[in-house]
Amino acid sequence: PHDQFIKIGDDLYYISSNGRTGNITIDGKDYYVGRYGRVLRGSFNVYQEPPYYDDETGEAVKKTGFVKSYGRWYYIEEDGKKAKGLKEIDGKLYFFSNNPMNKYETNEQVRGQLARPYFYISFPNRAEDNPTYYFDAETGAAVTNQFVYADGHWYYFGKDGKALLFDQVVNGQHLYFDYEGKQVKGDFVTDYKGTRYYDENSGELVTNQTRTINGVTYHFDEIGRAKQL
């Protein structure tokens, strides 16, 4: 048989008399036929670019919203283009990769990892200009108002999804996070306020006590300033 669709197992094939593959139009409908005549279904093309090919028929369709293709998630805007960078959807913040230096960038959704959307800004004027976020592994939404342990460090993400930086009070505890949002635990911090120490377990600022750390004894006053004894 020639010039017809055939279902074999879970796959759909198009048998053509001239062996056509790639982008083809059949009865006014667009399809993508790969090697051996297999019809692409339930994804974008191999370059992860729209249009989207229907899950069942393989017909090119206009699709909007979240779309899964080759195991990765994307968001299609009303104009048919993929979302790029940070995007608020239904009150939640998402991030779609957007590296201007990568010509193969596909704008896939970031899930289950830390991300700095403006990572290509090598030397921002302020740490706050290049915030760190964590995007949930299941939904891809930026987590808010919670601690997250990622890449060997603790972070706390505020109500806007940004990792807290520097001196912060979280749940009544005085904590410190570096310029990337990593929580300081079991270490000293020195700045215009003096030298302070943050507990190795809780990360809380040590105050009003004497401690021996790495063989050296210090007294910490009411605001945490260390004085070597």
Locations of the language-model features?
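Extracellular adhesion/carbohydrate-binding repeat motifs centered on closely spaced tryptophans
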Residues: 1-229
